Swiss-Prot record:
GO terms for cellular component: cytosol. One of its GO terms (molecular function) is RNA binding. InterPro entries: NusB-like_sf (IPR035926), NusB_fam (IPR011605), NusB_RsmB_TIM44 (IPR006027). The keyword Transferase does not apply. GO terms for biological process: DNA-templated transcription termination; transcription antitermination. The keyword Transcription applies. Keywords: RNA-binding, Transcription, Transcription antitermination, Transcription regulation. Involved in transcription antitermination. Required for transcription of ribosomal RNA (rRNA) genes. Binds specifically to the boxA antiterminator sequence of the ribosomal RNA (rrn) operons. It comes from Pseudoalteromonas translucida (strain TAC 125). It comes from the Bacteria. This is Transcription antitermination protein NusB. Belongs to the NusB family.
Length: 136
């Protein structure tokens, strides 16, 4: 798949993870709804599903891996930042086919698109520290 298809998959996965965090609904139901509501012709659908379901299944482990690198408890983070850190942590830990620099850069871009003003700086700082523990 083209890098653009993966970026679109990450964007959709971020939206699914955010929705899952807010609603508590089953991630499979959220994935299905996202696929119905969006034009998926230029999205790596399998990658989207892997990211969204992978985060939902492994979120506790991902949160624990990132938490030591935070200045406040994970559950006090902004919901968007929480979703971005979970998504990127999943990529770093479970998707070794994705170079760590790509995973971090894509997360920074997501933070610029969806996060607060300096969210991208925060995400970058946390991931720069956490990558050593996530990617062994």
């Amino acid at each position: 798949m083209k890098p653009a298809a993966r970026r679109k998959a990450r964007i959709l996965a971020l939206q699914a993870i955010y929705s899952w965090q807010l609603s508590g609904n089953a991630i499979a139901d959220i994935e299905q709804q996202m696929l119905i509501e969006n034009d998926v012709t230029k999205i790596d659908v399998e990658y989207f599903k892997d990211l969204a379901s992978g985060v939902a299944v492994n979120y506790k482990q991902l949160d624990e891996a990132v938490s030591p690198h935070l200045t406040r408890p994970f559950d006090e983070l902004d919901m968007v930042e929480r979703a971005i850190l979970r998504l990127s942590s999943y990529e770093l830990k479970f998707r070794e086919d994705v170079p760590y620099k790509v995973a971090i850069n894509e997360s920074i871009e997501l933070a610029k698109m969806f996060g607060a003003e300096d969210s991208h700086k925060f995400v970058n700082g946390v991931l720069d520290k956490a990558v050593k523990h996530l990617r062994k």
